[in-house]
Each structure stands twice: as C-alpha cells, then as structure tokens.
Regions:
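Flexible cytoplasmic inter-helical loops of multi-pass small-molecule transporters
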Residues: 177, 190-214
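Conserved MFS/SLC helix-loop-helix module at the cytosolic interface between two early adjacent transmembrane helices
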Residues: 69-108
Length: 225
C-alpha cells in the first residue's frame, strides 16, 4: 500500500489548496515567533527575577523537553487518531504559557510557563505538517518549503520583536504579545474546519468504495424458504 493511501486524505486527490497552505504557514510563523521569543527574554528574566545561569538552563530544558521530545509522541497519537482542532489547542497552550510568563514572579512559574509554550509547539507541529501535505495537491516539496518558510520567518521575528518592544522595559510587556497566539488560535480554528471536512470526505469515499459483504448462506436460505 502506498503512503498516500495510508494517510487520512490522499494529497494527490485534490488540487493544491493555496489558501490553506498560506494559512498553515502563517500559523507556523506565529507559533515559532513565540517559541523564539522565550530565549530572547532570558537576559530580562535573569535580571528581574535574579536567576542563575543554572536556572536559565533548567528553563531551556523544560522548554525543549515539551517542545521537541514530546513531538514524536503527539505525532504517533495523531497518526492513529487525527485531531483537526489540535492546531488551535496547541496555540491555546502557547497563549496560557505566554500570559503566565508575563506575570511570573518566581522561578517555578517561569519554568511552568516555558513548558506550556513548548507544549503548544509540540501539539501544533505534527498536525500542521500533515495539513501542509494534505493541501499540497501532490506538490509536496512546494508545500513543505512554504510551510518551513513560515517557521523560519517566525524564528527570526521573535528576537527582533523582543528587542524592539521588551528589552529595557518591564517583564509585563510580554503580555503585549498575547495578540500573536490569539490571532493564531482563530486562524488555526478555520484550518481545523477545513481539515475536518477533508477527513469526513475521505471517510465517506472509503465507505462508498468498500465492497459489500455477502449475506451469510443461512440468511439466504431462510429468505428463500
């Protein structure tokens, strides 16, 4: 069986959905903007909360454990049970983590905030990659490249925004950035609607294509009799 046949929706069966590709790439930009914002805040957090370099390292560890190592687990689960709205759910975790980060007044609070921001990323990426492939219409290289450009742009944008709006200011200014995951939540909810519709169409087509099971011989004989 081909990989396309195993996927929830065979990408080559649909024309390239450029609108969805652009939307999921924009979602990737917004997600990675917040992901790259956290390391850019380390000098501010170190000064405002009097953190040691060891504590900064632990924040990075908590962030990377949830953002990176948890991703394959999420991917395994969603391969078996696709979750169209996990895209928006991931952005929701990022939003909660960002708000907590803005008003954290202790090291444990920052640690939890970093873990939540990382968790949002790990939930977002597996299904976002799947959506990019589904919307590719068979142009997998183009779709993946466009999706990756969004993420790379976000990684570059986060530190720049931190330097412009947060550096040399109060930690609470981080709250200004809640607009980013809020926009992302709305955008990815709409992508989730499209994803859910594609899954429903695929399942309906699979049911129509399934061969009709023959009636048991006993039922046939009973009906004739």
């Amino acid at each position: 069986m081909s990989s396309a046949a195993k996927s929830p929706v065979a990408p080559s069966a649909h024309p390239t959905a450029l609108r969805i590709l652009l939307a999921i790439s924009a979602g990737h930009l917004l997600n990675d903007t917040i992901q790259s914002l956290l390391p850019a805040l380390y000098p501010l957090l170190k000064e405002s909360l009097n953190l040691s370099f060891a504590q900064i390292g632990l924040i990075t560890l908590a962030f990377q454990l949830t953002a990176s190592l948890l991703q394959p687990v999420v991917g395994l689960v969603t391969d078996r049970h696709p979750q169209p709205y996990s895209l928006a759910t991931g952005m929701g975790f990022t939003l909660v983590g960002l708000v907590l980060l803005a008003f954290a007044r202790s090291f444990p609070a920052v640690l939890i905030a970093g873990a939540l921001v990382g968790l949002g990323s790990s939930i977002f990426h597996p299904e976002a990659s799947r959506v990019a492939r589904m919307a590719s219409g068979g142009r997998h290289g183009f779709a993946q490249s466009l999706f990756q450009v969004g993420g790379n742009a976000g990684s570059a944008l986060g530190p720049l925004l931190a330097a412009l709006f947060i550096a040399h200011h109060a930690q609470s200014r981080v709250a200004w950035f809640v607009v980013v995951p809020i926009i992302g939540f709305g955008l990815l909810t709409r992508v989730g609607h499209w994803y859910k519709a594609q899954l429903s169409a695929h399942h309906a087509a699979a049911r129509r294509a399934a061969p009709t099971a023959p009636l048991p011989r006993g039922k046939v004989i009973a009906a004739i009799a």
